[in-house]
Amino acid sequence: MTLEEEYRLSCYEELTTLGNHNHIYLVKHKLSGEIFVKKVLSRFSLDVYKQLRDLQIPGIPKIHDLILENNSLILIEDYIHGQTLEQLLAEQTTLVYSDALAIMRKLCDVLKSLHTLTPPIIHRDLKLSNIILTSENLVYIVDFD
């Protein structure tokens, strides 16, 4: 890791770990006060993350920084405030048809954006816990690791 990369990482204060993951942290940028997610990945495709960072696809959290350290990738991305589709279905057990259809259409739009890239990006682990719904009715796909 370069001195510049160390400095960039030092600008983030770790607040807490997210969920059961000891490699995903909620962090706060010390200067702006903005909240982000920091992930330390041991298995990753650097090309995929660079492509996601450079393209900023709607429905995918914006990646702000990528830093290689030893055999890990440290990733800083937007924190998406909302609940997973898994959480929503645990609370409601069923969805109104029109709501389910709207979620699926938005999800398909995000997947189409990923799959029509050259080269295409395939998530490979799409599940209810990797789909976040926001209070603004936006759909995000997370966890490309």
Feature map (PLM): residue ranges:
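ATP-binding glycine-rich loop module of kinase domains
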Residues: 20-44
